[in-house]
Curated annotation (Swiss-Prot):
It is found in: Nucleus envelope; Presynapse; Cell projection, Axon; Perikaryon. GO terms for biological process: amelogenesis; bone mineralization; brain development; circadian behavior; enamel mineralization; gene expression; hemopoiesis; locomotion. The lineage of its organism: Eukaryota, Metazoa, Chordata, Craniata, Vertebrata. Coiled coil: none annotated. This is Protein rogdi homolog.
Length: 287
């Protein structure tokens, strides 16, 4: 019995020593690694910061789709904003070619990119507040920090992977519709959004439902991408989507950022798991 107790005490002493090393050394090593990764992620957003001068660089992306050649164009991305959009639309019925582009005095902010970058900056701020001189006293303190960092990283990732669901009236009311010259025809709606590592542009062609129409009018709810047949009211008119054209382009640095988010979340979870291993030995006391 005495031997077993001595062995248990010795084992506990070893575990306590390992845990102190984890708190005082390995935790800070992981925090440094996380900061380095997230700084790289932040740089991928190519926005001007305190250490950079001038506007963000412009990048041109050709829109394409394997399913349609009705829409072609080029989008110019500058940091978190579309600084130019040059779009050609071939009308399905008569093959008439429509061309429209952003007015030169206009830019369209991509809120998804801006929000994702802000969440990354917040995660970096949380990590920087626990520099090498800070002494973690409990595992619970580390878990709390990891949870806070993971929350910001999850929100950053979700902003890029989960586009907003919008109703057709919300798209119609969007300022994006008024960005173009010449002015978009009243039977066209345009939406732009980020989905994973892609910048997507959707053009909706509409037709008016006549008061004598026998169709059962059912307004469509919110969606990332509406289908032909979706209906909505706008002003005094009832409208229906007749054609949907979606084109997209891959943004390489968004893919990089998503990879950095995934790696960072894995590092956070691994550190949490190591802390939790010790908790099973100290279930009756704070760890």
């Amino acid at each position: 019995m005495a031997t077993a107790m001595a062995a248990s005490a010795a084992e506990r002493a070893v575990l306590e020593e390992e845990f102190r090393w984890l708190l005082h050394a390995e935790v800070h090593a992981v925090l440094r690694q996380l900061q380095d990764i997230l700084k790289e992620a932040s740089l991928r957003f190519t926005l001007p910061g305190p250490s950079t001068e001038g506007p963000a660089k412009q990048e041109n992306f050709i829109l394409g789709s394997c399913g349609t050649d009705q829409v072609k164009g080029v989008l110019t991305l500058q940091g978190d904003a579309l600084s130019q959009a040059d779009v050609n639309l071939k009308m399905p019925r008569n093959n008439q070619l429509l061309h429209f582009a952003f007015r030169e005095d206009k830019q369209w902010k991509l809120q998804q990119i801006q929000d994702a970058r802000n969440h990354v900056s917040q995660a970096i701020y949380l990590l920087a507040n626990r520099d090498e001189s800070y002494q973690f006293k409990t595992g619970a303190e580390v878990l709390k920090l990891m949870d806070a960092v993971m929350l910001q990283l999850t929100r950053a990732r979700n902003r890029l992977t989960t586009p907003a669901t919008l109703t057709l009236p919300e798209i119609a009311a969007s300022g994006l519709t008024r960005m173009f010259a010449p002015t978009l025809p009243s039977d066209l709606l345009v939406n732009v959004y980020i989905n994973l590592n892609k910048l997507c542009l959707t053009v909706y062609q509409l037709h008016t439902l006549q008061p004598t129409s026998t169709k059962n009018f059912r307004p469509a709810g919110g969606a990332v991408l509406h289908s032909p047949g979706a209906m909505f009211e706008w002003g005094s008119q009832r409208l229906e989507v007749s054609h949907v054209h979606k084109v997209e382009c891959v943004i390489p640095w968004l893919n990089d950022a998503l990879v950095y988010f995934t790696v960072s979340l894995q590092l956070c979870q691994q550190l949490k798991d190591k802390i939790s291993v010790f908790s099973s030995y100290w279930s009756s006391r704070p760890f």
